[in-house]
């Protein structure tokens, strides 16, 4: 009995170590949070320091020079604007030393300012994006890290790297508060 328990414990520890080593293929872990209030203007997510928080954890022992690619999309996939990896953004690389580091959407503006890969649109046009308003729906913002020089994937694919689900609604028409009905102006 004692021998079989020791064998079972050894097998469990070995299985755990093997699964951990397979789970750590990508050296970066991205966590994305979108905070309320949720705006229909996509620019608000990168102009407001309190709207989007991105935590990048570098699990390796070396600093990484990266760029981010990703998408903002409805859960049903009917609306999607996506920048795929394979072409670094026009700005300098984002340097991520070992450990966990938090960024806001505004922190990333200088890095992405020069643009990057081609934006692919589904269910929305470039003109609608330029006008700044996203259609109503339930959205997620998903990000993935790539090596700035080699374009090697450094973080896991969706759904990892995706934000919480957030709902965008268009404001209703204004309500007239004054004057009261029958009151003279």
Feature map (PLM): residue ranges:
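Proline-enriched interdomain boundary motifs that mark the N-terminal boundary
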Residues: 29-30, 171-179
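Boundary at the C-terminal end of the N-terminal hydrophobic targeting segment
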Residues: 21-25
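Signal that preferentially marks extracellular ectodomain short beta-strand elements
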Residues: 101-135
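Contiguous beta-strand segments within globular domains
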Residues: 34-76, 181-185
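Beta-strand-rich extracellular modules
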Residues: 144-148
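Bacterial N-terminal signal peptides
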Residues: 9-20
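Short beta-strand elements
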Residues: 149-174
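A glycine-anchored, Pro-Gly-centered beta-turn/N-cap motif
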Residues: 135-142
């Amino acid at each position: 009995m004692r021998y079989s328990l020791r064998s079972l414990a050894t097998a469990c520890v070995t299985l755990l170590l093997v699964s951990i080593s397979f789970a750590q293929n990508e050296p970066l872990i991205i966590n994305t949070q979108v905070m309320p209030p949720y705006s229909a203007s996509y620019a608000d997510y990168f102009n407001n320091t309190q709207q989007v928080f991105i935590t990048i954890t570098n699990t390796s022992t070396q600093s990484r020079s990266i760029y981010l690619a990703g998408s903002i999309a409805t859960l049903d996939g009917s609306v999607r604007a996506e920048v795929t990896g394979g072409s670094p953004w026009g700005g300098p690389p984002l340097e991520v030393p070992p450990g966990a580091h938090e960024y806001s959407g505004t922190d990333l503006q200088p890095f992405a300012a020069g643009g990057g890969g081609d934006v692919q649109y589904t269910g929305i046009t470039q003109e609608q994006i330029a006008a700044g308003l996203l259609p109503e729906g339930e959205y997620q913002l998903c990000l993935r890290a790539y090596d700035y020089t080699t374009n090697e994937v450094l973080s896991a694919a969706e759904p990892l790297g995706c934000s919480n689900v957030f709902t965008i609604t268009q404001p209703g028409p204004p309500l007239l508060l004054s004057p009261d009905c029958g009151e003279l102006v």
